[in-house]
């Protein structure tokens, strides 16, 4: 993807996948390209993040597990010669309450993406989001 986003023509010949010279347009507005974020909780995901991505997107991780993962991510990044601070963590799928969100931020998340229940009307959804905002931003 990085080659497609940054080069006029790109090709790839690897062990598992090949593609001939191709062009891809339009090019991303973000330079050099949009952030690449990998999700997952597999044992090797943190190494993949260090090797290929700009961030990690774990789903509903506990603060304790996140703290452990952040330390491991920092260790792997340092070994690879990367600045650990260049790798973001965006936890998603969380309940939108202060007692859930704040411990995740304290444990090393750069951002927490909340999940909300669906409402039937725009007014109901607005009311819910205003309550969430009042709880989180005080």
Describe each PLM feature range.
Residues 1-138:
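Active-site-adjacent structural elements that line small-molecule/cofactor binding pockets in enzymes
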């Amino acid at each position: 993807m990085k080659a497609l986003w940054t080069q006029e023509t790109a090709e790839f010949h690897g062990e598992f996948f090949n593609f001939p010279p191709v062009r891809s347009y339009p090019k991303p507005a973000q330079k050099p390209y949009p952030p690449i974020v990998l999700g997952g909780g597999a044992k090797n995901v943190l190494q993949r993040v260090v090797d290929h991505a700009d961030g990690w997107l774990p789903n509903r991780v506990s603060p304790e597990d996140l703290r452990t993962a952040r330390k491991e991510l920092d260790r792997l990044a340092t070994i690879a010669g990367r600045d650990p601070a260049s790798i973001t963590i965006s936890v998603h799928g969380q309940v939108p309450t202060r007692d859930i969100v704040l411990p995740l931020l304290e444990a090393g998340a750069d951002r927490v993406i909340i999940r909300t229940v669906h409402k039937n009307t725009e007014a109901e959804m607005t009311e819910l989001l205003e309550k969430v905002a009042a709880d989180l931003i005080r």
